[in-house]
Amino acid sequence: VEVQGVGLGCCYGYRVHGPVSSAGPGFHPTKVLLDPCARAISGWDVYQRGMAISDHDNSAHCLKAVVTERDHFDFSNHPRPRRAWRETVIYELHPGGFSRDSNSPASAEHRGTFLGLIDALPYLQSLGITAIELLPSMAFDPADAPDGRQNYWGYSPLSWFAPHHGYVCGDDPLAGRQQLRQLVAACHDHGLEVFVDVVYNH
C-alpha cells in the first residue's frame, strides 16, 4: 500500500473490514492493526495489551507503525569480516541485559541499549571472540508473559523488522533502526560479525 504525501515519521495502522464471527478469529473493524512489515513502531507510552483483545476500539491504546526512510544503510565502509566457520567463536548475549549492570563498560546513559553494546565492544573483542549473537532484538511486548511476569527474552515478537524500543536510547521511534545499524557497523569495525537470533515458532 502506498499513500502519496505521507512523510517520514508519520504514524499509521490498518483497520480490516469483513465478516465478524463469534466462533473464532475474524475481521474486527474496531481494531487498529500493526503493519506486519513496519520498520519502526510508536505508541509504547499508551499501549495497553488488554485493549488488543477486548471488543472495544483500541485506537487510543495501540501500537502504530511509523513511516521510515526507504534507503538502505551503506555498510561498504564497514565490511563484514567473513570468517570461516572453523575460525568462528560466537558470544551469545542479551541486547539489553548485557550492558545494563553498573559494572558494565557501557556509559550510564547507554546501559541496556544497542549503544551500550557499542561501548562494550573493546571488552568483547578482548575475549578473543569473532562474533556476537544477539538474542531477539526485534519489537516485542514486555507484557506477553503469564502471571504478571515480564517477557525479558524477547521471543514472540510483534514485528520482525522493527528494533525493540527498550534497547534504544531516547524516545524517537526512528532512532532504533539507526542505533542498530550503528552497532552492526561498529562490530564490523572491531572485526566482529553479528548474528541475530530469530525463532519463528514462539
Task: Label each residue range with its predicted role.
Residues V1-V3:
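Ligand-binding face of N-terminal immunoglobulin V-set domains in extracellular IgSF glycoproteins
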Residues G5-E92, S99-E109:
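The feature marks proteins involved in alpha-glucan
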Residues N77-R82, D119-G128, V184-H188:
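Short amphipathic alpha-helices and their capping/turn segments at secondary-structure boundaries
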Residues V89-Y91, I132-L134, V194-V196:
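Hydrophobic faces of well-ordered beta-strands that scaffold small-molecule active sites
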Residues G96, S137-A139, V199-N201:
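Active-site beta-loop-alpha junctions enriched in small/polar residues
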Residues G96-I132:
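A conserved hydrophobic secondary-structure block that centers on an alpha-helix together
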Residues S104-T113, D144-D189:
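Aromatic- and acidic-residue-enriched carbohydrate-binding clefts of CAZyme catalytic domains
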Residues L124-A145, R149:
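Carboxylate/His-rich catalytic cores and anion/metal-binding grooves
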